[in-house]
Amino acid sequence: MAKKVKGNRVQVVLECAEHKESGLPGTSRYITTKNKKNTTTRLELKKYNPILKKMTLHKEIK
């Protein structure tokens, strides 16, 4: 039997902040992982938004 390992790495969803405010249909979301021990705050990364066709700020959502 495999033992359960309680890890610090969790999956998080990043959603485009600029697209959300624009009111256009659709959403740009990315899934990534982060280490809860090292990164206690919410992630904010610049990622490519294919709907707006440019690099935008993506924030972690719950």
From Swiss-Prot:
InterPro entries xrefs: Ribosomal_bL33, Ribosomal_bL33_sf, Ribosomal_zn-bd
Record keywords, A-Z: Ribonucleoprotein, Ribosomal protein
GO cellular component: cytoplasm; ribonucleoprotein complex; ribosome
Pfam short name (any one): Ribosomal_L33
Keyword Cell division: no
A GO MF label: structural constituent of ribosome
GO biological process per UniProt: translation
UniProt family annotation: Belongs to the bacterial ribosomal protein bL33 family.
Protein name: Large ribosomal subunit protein bL33
